[in-house]
Amino acid sequence: MSNPISSISFADRVRVPDDVLISNLQDESVILNLDSERYFGLDNVGTRMLTVLNSSDSIEAAYQSLAEEYDVDRQVLRQDMLSLIENLLKQGLIQVSRNA
């Protein structure tokens, strides 16, 4: 079940649901929810963030991985990740769930 946006925790897990398709186009990607027909475009950094989030056990694990990969202020990365998660969640393009 999806969390309300205000209660997103870095211990939570992000997944792309089965009814959402991701199409990579050179340096960006387009994400489409087949049920709602909503879509969202991501640049190469957003695409990488989503890929790491979707394959990690938690938002925190994805954050740590991306912090090692990119030379960026950690607070900026944390804010950018939360912004991306909130936007994709509002569009119904990801699910956020509590880790057990």
Region annotations inferred by a language model:
Residues M1-T47, T51, S97-A100:
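Acidic, low-complexity/disordered tracts enriched in E/D and polar residues
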Residues R38-A100:
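Long, charge-rich, low-complexity alpha-helical segments
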